[in-house]
């Protein structure tokens, strides 16, 4: 996609940047000495802005990445994770923000893509102060970015953010937990995959290897079980696994063993990059369709899925229900309308599969093209001053 590049923003109320000790070497390649290489990372996928904020009183360290505001304000959740490095946190925020742009575009929403990450242990008891600091960070962007719940955060955390900014969704008493709507959209997407692959969208008797039994994975398991699917599940939390086993008649396996399960469908519903060089050698499935973000470690792994004859539901298409749910809150939609809109993921995926077949490209590229067509069309409209 082609969008005008913008400068990187930075807000940091207790951080100063020292002068460089030496002039930059014009012959040095960006990033070759291991520095953060911020602008190269921004330019790679044409992100508009990154804002970094540090609050010494709470220990808050946060990054907000805005990929695109062509279709509207950037919306994306806040992820609270103990990253191995600041660079890993930044790259995660950038990838997730780009995914949100494309997710909003293919879902037909008037929103751009953004994401925020808080670096640290999400088991901290100091949640109010920490999330109020994050709320001030969000507020500093003056509506260019709207946040919501994500991995490691909750609706209660969103209430703390609300004390400092109105640019937050997923609040208690409003749209609330997006997991049920996200799971319903994924369920409809799985059925679309079955329709494309087998000519029928029935999941009765289909075997599903479910990776992740958290909020979305649990609700998805219930929907799959209700239709007669046979589930094998895993999660790093034994209590989550126990609930799915007891309520959905699932078989449990160790976390790493899920890749070796022979099944019709692999449904990744935890963290990303699970389709990689190692797991591709182990998967024994015909369909990959789940709620996790950034499922492909690299684009070439999507090419390899295609080469192996595995039908892949692009992650940002099939997991768009959560974004649809928070968009419903922004516009005052009834819950039934949000669920109905999430159900349209079925038709969107069939369109993606059609483009892939017609153009002879992997499904992840077909999804990108569908999103980019809409973004480019609106960018042309908005270039005129009114």
In which residue ranges do the predicted regions lie?
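N-terminal ligand-binding/catalytic initiation module
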Residues: 1-172
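Glycine-rich phosphate/diphosphate-binding loop of Rossmann-like nucleotide-binding domains
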Residues: 177-265
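Short glycine/serine/threonine-rich phosphate/pyrophosphate-binding segments
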Residues: 180, 215-220, 274-275, 296-298, ...
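Adenosine-phosphate binding glycine-rich loop
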Residues: 194, 286-386
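Rossmann-like adenosine-cofactor binding region
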Residues: 236-317
């Amino acid at each position: 996609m082609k969008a005008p590049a913008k400068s990187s923003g930075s807000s940091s109320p207790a951080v100063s940047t020292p002068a460089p000790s030496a002039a930059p070497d014009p012959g040095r390649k960006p990033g070759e000495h291991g520095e953060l290489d911020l602008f190269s990372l921004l330019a790679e996928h044409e992100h508009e802005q990154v804002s970094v904020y540090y609050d010494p009183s709470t220990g808050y360290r946060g990054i907000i990445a805005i990929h695109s505001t062509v279709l509207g304000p950037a919306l994306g959740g806040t992820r609270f994770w103990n990253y191995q490095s600041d660079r890993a946190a930044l790259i995660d925020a950038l990838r997730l923000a780009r995914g949100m742009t494309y997710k909003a575009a293919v879902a037909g929403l008037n929103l751009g893509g953004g994401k925020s990450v808080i670096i640290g242990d999400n088991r901290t008891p100091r949640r109010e102060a920490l999330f109020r600091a994050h709320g001030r960070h969000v507020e500093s962007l003056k509506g260019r970015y709207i946040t919501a719940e994500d991995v490691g955060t909750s609706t209660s955390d969103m209430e703390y953010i609300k004390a400092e900014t109105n640019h937050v969704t997923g609040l208690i008493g409003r749209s609330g937990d997006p997991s049920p709507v996200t799971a319903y959209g994924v369920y409809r997407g799985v059925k679309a995959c079955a329709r494309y692959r087998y000519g029928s969208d029935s999941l009765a008797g289909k075997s599903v290897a479910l990776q992740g039994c958290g909020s979305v994975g649990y609700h998805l398991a219930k929907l799959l079980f209700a239709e007669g699917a046979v589930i094998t599940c895993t999660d790093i939390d034994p209590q989550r696994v126990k609930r799915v086993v007891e309520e959905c008649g699932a078989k449990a396996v160790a976390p790493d063993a899920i890749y070796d399960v022979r099944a019709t469908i692999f449904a990744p519903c935890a963290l990303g990059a699970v389709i990689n060089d190692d797991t591709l050698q182990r998967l024994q499935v015909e369909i990959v369709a789940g709620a996790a973000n950034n499922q492909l470690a690299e684009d070439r792994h999507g090419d390899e899925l295609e080469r192996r004859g595995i039908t892949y539901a692009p992650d940002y298409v099939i997991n768009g229900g959560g974004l649809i749910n928070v968009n419903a809150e922004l516009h005052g939609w009834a819950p039934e309308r949000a669920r109905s809109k999430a159900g349209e993921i079925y038709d969107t995926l069939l369109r993606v599969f059609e483009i892939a077949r017609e153009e002879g490209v992997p499904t992840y590229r077909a999804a990108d093209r569908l999103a980019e067509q809409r973004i480019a069309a609106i960018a042309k409209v908005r270039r005129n001053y009114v």
